[in-house]
């Protein structure tokens, strides 16, 4: 996707290891050979896209709540944004670090970074997990499922079930159309989506493949100017009448970053879940302001 990749890490030895490991894959790639090297924050001045993965992550056996990372990673994010904004305010920043929505909000608001250029991976991977799980239940390809996980990348995320469909077949017709023995258990499925990433951490120590491809999906949409609609974390500016937080909404992603956000019509259950999510994230932000 990119012809030049610069790795920045306070541990230069580790950065060099990442560069060496990644550079060996270029022999297999049927694309332009990328120049992969170790760099510094000064390299940000020429960057089109900056991907932030810095800070500690959830560890096996510890809390399953990403908010335990809050205090440490807020400081890490502030340090990184101070460095980045010294050299650029025009690069698209993709935040991968947790707690996702809090860090995305702080990075945009405290540094007055252009809203459309600061994107969190948010519920993009949660949505992929949901589509895969629902597709398996119905016996179809996950790419035929249209459905979004919205809100927080965490415990208050929710699914607007009224907007879920498979090739136009509405969710309430799934049992009949796909020959299911019983209706889809919405609460159970959403719970499985929420905990699956944490389950992977317990099993292998970390998550990697899913989030890596999620980042690639965003980078690809930007580099190819796709105007793809994907769920991503963005600071709200009046969507659903809300502001003062970042959370995931369907976003149109292009070379300009977030071209626009879309608002899925919500039923009463969706509106209730949106309010719960908003109030939770707002309380967390106020606790660190």
Task: State what each model feature region is.
Residues 1, 55-59, 254-258:
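Short connector loops/turns at beta-strand edges and beta->alpha or beta->beta junctions
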Residues 110-117, 126-289:
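C-terminal substrate-binding/catalytic lobe of Rossmann-fold NAD(P)-dependent dehydrogenases
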Residues 3-6, 118:
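Short beta-strand element of Class I
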Residues 65-131:
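Rossmann-like NAD(P)(H) cofactor-binding subdomain of soluble oxidoreductases
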Residues 7, 52, 93-95:
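Structural beta-sheet core signal
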Residues 8-48, 283-287:
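Conserved N-terminal Rossmann-fold NAD(P) cofactor-binding segment
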């Amino acid at each position: 996707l990119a012809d030049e990749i610069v790795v920045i890490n306070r541990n230069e030895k580790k950065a060099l290891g990442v560069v060496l490991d990644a550079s060996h894959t270029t022999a297999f790639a049927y694309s332009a050979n990328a120049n992969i090297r170790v760099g510094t924050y000064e390299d940000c001045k020429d960057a089109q896209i900056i991907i932030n993965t810095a800070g500690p992550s959830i560890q096996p056996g510890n809390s399953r709540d990403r908010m335990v990372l809050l205090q440490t990673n807020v400081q890490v994010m502030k340090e990184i944004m101070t460095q980045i904004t010294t050299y650029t305010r025009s690069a698209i920043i993709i935040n991968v670090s947790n707690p996702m929505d809090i860090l995305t909000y702080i990075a945009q608001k405290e540094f007055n970074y252009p809203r459309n250029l600061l994107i969190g991976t948010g519920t993009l991977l949660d949505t992929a997990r949901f589509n895969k799980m629902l597709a398996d239940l119905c016996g179809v390809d996950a790419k035929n499922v249209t459905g979004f996980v919205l809100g927080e990348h965490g415990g208050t995320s929710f699914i607007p079930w009224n907007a879920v469909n498979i090739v136009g077949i509405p969710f309430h017709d799934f049992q009949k159309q796909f020959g299911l023995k019983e209706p889809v258990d919405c609460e159970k499925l959403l719970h499985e989506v929420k905990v699956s990433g944490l389950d992977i951490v317990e099993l292998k120590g970390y998550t990697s493949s899913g989030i890596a491809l999620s980042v690639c999906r965003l980078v690809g949409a930007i580099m190819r100017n796709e105007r793809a609609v994907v769920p991503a974390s963005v600071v709200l500016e009046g969507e659903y009448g809300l502001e003062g937080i970042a959370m995931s909404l369907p976003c149109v992603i292009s070379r300009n970053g977030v071209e626009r956000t879309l608002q899925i019509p919500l039923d009463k259950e969706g509106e209730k879940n949106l309010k719960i999510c908003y109030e939770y994230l707002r309380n967390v932000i106020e606790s660190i302001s």
